[in-house]
Swiss-Prot record:
Pfam families: Ribosomal_S11 (PF00411). GO terms for cellular component: ribonucleoprotein complex; ribosome. It comes from the Bacteria. NCBIfam families: PRK05309.1 (NF003698), uS11_bact (TIGR03632). It comes from Shewanella sediminis (strain HAW-EB3). The lineage of its organism: Bacteria, Pseudomonadati, Pseudomonadota, Gammaproteobacteria, Alteromonadales. Gene3D superfamilies: Ribosomal protein S11. This is Small ribosomal subunit protein uS11. One of its GO terms (molecular function) is structural constituent of ribosome. Transmembrane segments: none annotated. The gene is rpsK. Belongs to the universal ribosomal protein uS11 family.
Length: 130
């Protein structure tokens, strides 16, 4: 019986990306931060819920800050230095996520609000009575 040659474990080479894009999706319940390259391929991501916050603590600015720091540190392995930020949604973690990415050491070149605005599409949820 022929012996199958064993594959030696090879170290995977990470591609080096100088410029990236940070997509921040800030909803009322959670904040999702994805860092991609210029083509939109995801390099790293983090969420408030995945960072250890559950329930109503997910929707705090501090949870968004922690998630942005985790995504930012993970993307530094790819050599990302400059970020273009796209913010979507009305959530409380919008500004704190941008500040956290800045504090990690990224040079933020542009901030764009890409929140979808309906041209009178679906009926919005009813107003809360607290």
């Amino acid at each position: 019986m022929a012996k199958v040659p064993s594959r030696s474990p090879r170290k995977r080479v990470r591609k080096q990306v100088a410029d990236g894009m940070a997509h921040i999706h800030a909803s009322f319940n959670n904040t999702i931060i994805t860092i991609t390259d210029r083509q939109g391929n995801a390099l790293s991501w983090a969420t408030s819920g995945g960072s250890g916050f559950r329930g109503s603590r997910k929707s705090t600015p501090f949870a968004a800050q922690v998630a942005a720091e985790r995504a930012g540190v993970a993307a530094q392995d790819y050599g990302v230095k400059n970020l273009e930020v796209f913010v979507k949604g009305p959530g409380p973690g919008r500004e704190s996520a941008i500040r956290a990415l800045n504090s990690v050491g990224y040079k933020i070149t542009n901030i764009t609000d890409v929140t979808p605005i309906p041209h009178n599409g679906c009926r919005p949820p009813k107003k809360r009575r607290v």
